[in-house]
Amino acid sequence: MAVPGSSRRQPSNRGLVSHCTHHHIVVFLLTFFSYSLLHASRKTFSNVKVSISSQWTPSCLNSTTFELRPNELWNSNHLFPNAEEATLFLGTLDTIFLFSYAVGLFVSGIVGDRLNLRWVLSFGMCSSALVVFFFGTLTEWLHFYNKWFYCCLWVVNGLLQSTGWPCVVAVMGNWFGKAGRGFVFGLWSACASVGNILGAFLASCVLKYGYEYAFLVTASVQFAGGVIVFCGLLTSPKEVGLPELGADEEGSVEEDANRPLMGDDDADDDEGNYSIQAADTDSQPKAIGFFQACCLPGVVLYSLAYACLKLVNYSFFFWLPFYLSNNFGWKEAEADQLSIWYDVGGIIGGTIQGLISDVLQKRAPVLAISLLFAVGSLFGYSRSPNSKPINAVIMAITGFFIGGPSNMISSAISADLGRQDLVRGSSEALATVTGIVDGTGSIGAAVGQYLVSLIQENLGWMWVFYFFILMASSTILFISPLIVREIRLLLHERRLRMLAE
């Protein structure tokens, strides 16, 4: 059995660069921007909540104001008697979307491992764009307002959007091996934050013309992106005659970044028994089953942890612009632009923390330290003054310590789990494992969005932040066995290196 840190060469970022071709760059950019566009359309909904709430409630509350007749002509858009009920319904729509999104993730992961990933991704992007157009633009143009219709459209939108993440992570996992995966996926997982920034920017630019145009712009761009993905995305190196990732590129070494989660220390003795099919082989690897994927080491613990963390991350995603407008009285367009700083912090956090995890060759300790700081940053942001510069700084710090770990779990760690030794003979496990992790996270986020609106309405925003602190602490609790295990391995490797010297 090999001694950790001695005879086996550790994966390095230099090896990653040396194997990178222009196909890798194109795949990186296409998957990056395809998911950015999906997130931009989601962000649009959160950015126009104030405008939608105003449209759905009476504008004149003075009892002396005369009533316009006929009622169905002048007041058909007044779905709710006051802004509080409209806000609660918007929270319900968020919950509906996330529940259907979570269910769709479990299904999309399985479908993505059995069908062409390019077809599934492009279909989801184009179809979701049409649903967003119907929801926000066509209904307003036709002056058609119906709560049940909105709910049905958002269920369908959640199912269609769920095709995105498992597919793009699987494609990235097919092209990029374990060497430098923390850094590459940390940088690449900024796609969600870039999408949030893009959605906020597009919405703020056209919101003065009406919220329906914000939906129109993002839906049009997303549909065009789906067409480009269908025409240009390569889902695997074998499509252009390049060899697929081999065992050495996957870094199946004992000092591997997730080795404590992936199997026993002597698993590398059987390393030669695993291989990825050659480019000229016609046989397809058998896709892993759903329950088999759930039983893989680390999948359940990271899924539960991500359920708590995604609840917090998506609460900022859905409610931050509304919170800034509601709590500080800032204009909606200003709140949209200021909320970008949370995503900027998430981009920087995901990249830096991914790089650190590559250097340490461990993921869980990096997550634990970041989440401990996240608790403090949440407490600090809950007491942020009515000052835009100070609010933006604390918001970026909060995004760094919450968005960073969230990006790492949903991308690099999911790819690690989907390509561990136990599934080395089945390269069709990536989308399934990613769907399980992200699907479980979305269930937690779905429950959280309704709880946020409920807590805010009854107890106020301060208790919402206390709830976030509790969820961030629960994330640490779920991954604590993995943290202890990886720290022990780090200390063991350090002792061996000292003895070798």
Swiss-Prot record:
Membrane-spanning segments: 20-40, 87-107, 119-139, 153-173, 183-203, 214-234, 298-320, 340-360, 364-384, 393-413, 435-455, 459-479
Cross-referenced Pfam families: MFS_1
GO MF entries: transmembrane transporter activity
Keywords (A to Z) from UniProt: Endoplasmic reticulum, Glycoprotein, Lysosome, Membrane, Sugar transport, Transmembrane, Transmembrane helix, Transport
Cell compartment(s), UniProt: Endoplasmic reticulum membrane; Lysosome membrane
Matching SUPFAM superfamilies: MFS general substrate transporter (SSF103473)
Its membrane topology: Multi-pass membrane protein
Protein family per UniProt: Belongs to the major facilitator superfamily. Organophosphate:Pi antiporter (OPA) (TC 2.A.1.4) family.
Protein name: Sugar phosphate exchanger 3
UniProt organism field: Gallus gallus (Chicken)
Lineage: Eukaryota, Metazoa, Chordata, Craniata, Vertebrata
